[in-house]
Amino acid sequence: MRTREVLNQARDLLDDLNTFPVPNFNTGANLANSWTMAANVAKTLSPSLHPAEFMAALSRGVAKFPYGSVGIFLASGFAACAEAWGDIPVVRPADLLMAIDTMDQSFKEVAGADSWEFGLSHLISNISEQLSELELLTLTQVVDTALVCAQEATVDSADAHGGVGDAGLAGACLIFAALADLAAVAEGEAGVHVSTVQAMLRDWANRSRIVAESLRHTVPGGEFATTFHFEAVDMTTEKLRESLRAVSSEVLVCQIVDEFGVGHFVAHLHTPAPLTALPYSHGAVLIRHLNVLPEILEGDEDPLTKLTADFDNVVVLADFTARQTPLVAPGLLVLSSAPALVETYARAGATVLLGMDNPHQIGWAWHTLPTGRASLIVPTSSQSHQQALMMRDSLAATGSVDACVIVADTQDELSAAWLVQSLQGKRFRGALSEQARDLETACQDLRARIRVEPMSGQNLRTQIRDFANDLGSNRELHAVISSENASTDRMNLQLALSDYDDIELVAYYGGQPGVTCIGVRF
């Protein structure tokens, strides 16, 4: 619980740092969310469990809804502890060394042949090497050694990257510091490690701010971060990784054994082709585009150029300061079932939960959105709309979410696609409640300019004629074709439009469950 509090306090600090080799400024949120998931699982477990059973349960909990690469490593680390400890009733310092050795091998399997010189896998190897040189092991010695190794790796990473270190390593420093404080208190000492590490990281982040901001605004290409579960018979971790590596720049894979002894793969990829990279059979997929949506400051005019006899200095500077309130992009989450629209959503700045098979996955996906801004959940069916409302209310009841989460009234893929595209580039300012109010108003205005209907099977020509009366100057009719009747519906639409030489059919092929949707924008 203490570690969860420490990581939640530091999430913004860690988000301001970088994760190498790909610029990725969400490590703080991913670490905090992953550890919160583990803490929530821990609260449901019996105190009489053996350490291995406890760690195995934590591993399954984190792997069920992993947050980025750090979630993969954390789940793998818990699983390694469970594997190392077996049936021992109490963990001794020497058993911690055994767990770290197992974790060393596990992390190498997660990352495969990828060489992360300053990454978490390299860190665990160093910790294992340092601990092997100790003759007498105490709990404090083990954790303090891990903390020193993490601090050294963080500093080395910063030296190697122009002053900006690896946020994952910085997070490891905080985790080990929290554990070191617990060990110190257990042995009758004062716990000061967390405050020391927080001060170190804060000072380091402040000094590297200029370099970090430059990296933050460097878009790492047209890649997508993709996280998914996968089940396979007679499939090794290495074999799965190799099959994914052909279309991915970064591949992390771990295998988690459930309470029934069945192995499940969890993978996190950076890939330019998220759908091509996926295995044939997989569960829900969480996808976001690795772009950067920077804050914008309104008014870039130098106020000093306005200082004449007609202006009061204080008033002018105060006005300029007020106009410098940052404009921020809202967090967008789309609950989609249309693979063909995934890139459309993601390139417009939305996180996409594709193929949701568990309503609780909405909460998992929502927690990946940036903090400190209003967020919008965009359903694409009546079922996902109802599930989104229920999940929002459930999160609110537990204090996990405030009134700044809005659920759009979209209930089809076409309306969702148009809404997300229309919100692309829009920024909002002010407190969260003000952002939410303005975002909700913008959604209502945009939805008023969208008309979408299920395609009529009996009176399609009449329906097209009615649509034609509403078409704007672009004279475009759009459609999301049903996956069940794709060829037939596309042909029927084209035949019905043959009477209108000046109307173009623009179809999003790939479809949605259920009936085909057609619509126009005003």
Residue ranges of predicted features:
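N-terminal loops that bind phosphate or other acidic moieties
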Residues: 1-522
